Regions:
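A conserved acidic beta->alpha catalytic loop
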Residues: 49, 64-73
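Donor-binding/catalytic cores of nucleotide-activated saccharide
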Residues: 95, 116-232, 237-255
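N-proximal low-complexity "stem/linker" segments adjacent to membrane-targeting elements
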Residues: 1-51
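Short aromatic/hydrophobic "clamp" motif used to bind/position activated sugar donors
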Residues: 111
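Membrane-interface aromatic/basic loop that binds lipid-linked glycans or pyrophosphate carriers
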Residues: 7-10, 299-404
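Short beta-strand/loop segment that forms part of the nucleotide-sugar
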Residues: 57-66, 86-91, 115-116
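Cell-envelope/extracellular polymer assembly enzymes that use nucleotide-activated donors
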Residues: 28-31, 59, 217
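Glycine-rich, basic loop-to-helix element that forms the pyrophosphate-binding segment
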Residues: 90-106
């Protein structure tokens, strides 16, 4: 084809190449990605608090995941009124894939993945972005609280066990803390800002096949490769939570996915040569999370979850390649050891037998204690009666006996 027909000669730079050279590498400071699925009850609150950010140089990419309510209509109305808003309408592809779509489209120097039913402090992006730039961070997390939707109250979020490695805004990484890095922050993605180039270079994406804890996988992958991680302690995200029954139903439906999440994390670590350096951190992270989830699962699903681990996943996760002292908590070690030794039915029989034995011991101990208490009372009563008899005996003596 003649170059003259294209409007430039062979010696000249193509217009699109010239535009690429003159355009900034990152047109936005931050890309905000929000996957949306049937969130019309709270979507406006999320959108309004994002668009009211004090840092204004951001793009908001909303990925509607085939909503059947008014979510898409709400998103389109915001896009009409604010040029920073982009709406991507998808079929029901799942939250992980929806986030990946937003990640592919992102043009911000940093990226954050928020939830469509949460709400945010106006300084969220400004504080995280400035902190990331000042400290040259790959990942920065913020403090958050939980908003109990039904009771309309805020609950302080629990501190992570090894969150102190970021005390006073310290910068940490897997190099300084290989035994703790995966437990140093939550597995939530919605309270973290990531450097986009870092995510792209390391090819970190959400696993589309995961229905729960897809953000845990993403966060673990990022923490395992990041050179500079920190956090701010301001509460900038308000995460909406619902009643316990809602959570129980979620675990009941998808509990079989939990070991798969951690196995995928292990596979990622192995591909990148990070499993051996972070093996102790991965052990305690995966075992303690599985133990916690086991305790949250409804009683009628505990056996499935237990036997899933017993029949291969616990071994695949590497739990039995460690010594007792590698486990940070005895109850987590007991959980992992019992899974390796027993099926759920066998474990339950032993547990109930142990409870019965403890009950018998407690009953016998209580009986002995009660007997001792009664005996002590009887001795006190005897001494009192004896003393009382002596006192009254003096007054009952005849006058002449008293004179003598």
């Amino acid at each position: 084809m003649n170059n003259e027909n294209l409007g430039y000669t062979a010696d000249e730079i193509k217009p699109e190449e010239q535009a690429e050279q003159t355009a900034p590498k990152w047109p936005y400071k931050v890309s905000v990605v929000i996957p949306v699925y049937n969130a019309d009850d709270y979507l406006r609150s999320a959108m309004d608090t994002v668009l009211a950010q004090t840092l204004t140089e951001f793009e908001l990419i909303c990925v509607d995941d085939g909503s059947t309510d008014k979510s898409l209509e709400i998103l389109e109305s915001y896009a009409e009124n604010d040029q920073r808003v982009t709406v991507m309408a998808m079929s029901h592809i799942g939250i992980g894939t929806a986030r990946n779509k937003g990640l592919l489209k992102a043009k911000g120097e940093y990226i954050i993945f928020l939830d469509a039913d949460d709400f945010y402090e106006p300084t969220l992006l400004e504080v995280l972005y400035n902190t990331a730039k000042e400290k040259n961070l790959d990942v920065v997390a913020t403090g958050f609280d939980l908003y109990e939707n039904k009771k309309e109250r805020f609950i302080k979020s629990p501190e992570e066990e090894h969150g102190n490695i970021y005390a006073d805004g310290a910068v940490a990484s897997k190099n300084e803390y290989p035994d703790f890095i995966l437990q140093s922050t939550t597995g939530y993605v919605w309270n973290k800002l990531f450097r986009t180039a870092f995510i792209q270079e390391k090819e970190i994406v959400f696993a589309p096949e995961l229905y729960v804890f897809e953000d845990v996988y993403f966060v673990c992958c990022a923490l395992s490769l990041a050179d500079r991680v920190s956090r701010v302690y301001e509460t900038l995200v308000h995460h909406r939570i619902y009643h316990q029954q809602h959570r129980a139903r979620l675990f009941k439906k998808h509990s079989n996915q939990v070991p798969i999440v951690y196995l995928k994390v292990k596979e990622f670590l192995m591909r990148h040569g990070m499993y051996i350096p972070l093996s102790k951190s991965f052990l305690n992270f995966s075992a303690s999370r599985c133990y916690k989830i086991f305790n949250l699962i409804p009683a009628d699903k505990k056996d499935d979850f237990w036997d899933l681990l017993h029949n291969g996943y616990a071994d695949s996760l590497g739990w039995y390649r460690h010594e007792v002292h590698d486990f940070e908590h005895h109850d987590v070690y007991d959980f992992a050891a019992n899974i390796g030794l027993y099926t759920f039915d066998e474990y339950e029989r032993l547990r109930l037998k142990g409870k019965l034995k403890n009950l018998k011991t407690m009953t016998l101990d209580a009986l002995k204690k009660k007997i001792k208490q009664l005996q002590a009372k009887a001795r006190v009563r005897e001494r009192w009666n004896s003393l009382k008899g002596k006192i009254f005996g003096v007054f009952k003596k005849k006058p002449e006996q008293a004179e003598k």
